[in-house]
Amino acid sequence: MQKSTPPEDLSRLTLLGREAKPSRKLETFPNRHPDRDYIVTMETAEFTCVCPMTGQPDFADLHISYIPDASILESKSLKLYLWSYRNEGIFHEHVTNVILEDVVAALSPRWCKVTANFGVRGGISITVEAEYKKPGWSKP
């Protein structure tokens, strides 16, 4: 087994190593261990969007976990993707599900879960969990 990342894995990446702006484009690279079920978790404590009613900022700890199939999510593209929501007026429940849908569309993972823990607003915190399981796949 090759121990370093082969150059062909880098050929599809257009954002990594370059100055960039917010983007809704999620990039991937090949999973070199498709025969194994393993969990990848990406987390940020800096996710922001805005309330569509008040325009006030909403802050969340965001966790994206998935079991890859053929592809792995490239982290800079995820950072720029999440940044694109900074000024987006969108409800917590909706944005969590949209992020799940976009990650699933980019990766076609075996399993994926997005958890968003939003900060307290009006004395109430909101946690949204959205989950996807590839048809026919069952967790071992």
From Swiss-Prot:
Instruction: Give the annotated active site.
Output: C51, D58
Give the record's pathway.
Answer: tRNA modification; tRNA-queuosine biosynthesis
The protein in question is named NADPH-dependent 7-cyano-7-deazaguanine reductase
Q: So which domain of life are we looking at?
A: Bacteria
Single GO cellular component term: cytoplasm
Q: Where in the cell is it found?
A: Cytoplasm
Signal sequence segment: none
- Where, in this chain's numbering, is substrate bound? L73, E74, S75, H92, E93
Q: Which reaction does it catalyse?
A: 7-aminomethyl-7-carbaguanine + 2 NADP(+) = 7-cyano-7-deazaguanine + 2 NADPH + 3 H(+)
Family the entry assigns: Belongs to the GTP cyclohydrolase I family. QueF type 1 subfamily.
For this UniProt entry, the molecular function terms from Gene Ontology, in alphabetical order, are: preQ1 synthase activity
> What GO terms in the biological process aspect are recorded for it?
queuosine biosynthetic process; tRNA modification
Pfam families linked to this entry: QueF
Tell me its EC number(s), please: 1.7.1.13
Query: Predominant location of this chain?
Result: cytoplasm
Write out the entry's keywords from A to Z. Answer: Cytoplasm, NADP, Oxidoreductase, Queuosine biosynthesis
Q: What class of enzyme is it?
A: oxidoreductase
Q: Which InterPro entries match?
A: GTP-CH-I_C/QueF, NADPH_dep_7-cyano-7-deazaG_red, QueF, QueF_type1
Write out the function statement from the record. Answer: Catalyzes the NADPH-dependent reduction of 7-cyano-7-deazaguanine (preQ0) to 7-aminomethyl-7-deazaguanine (preQ1).
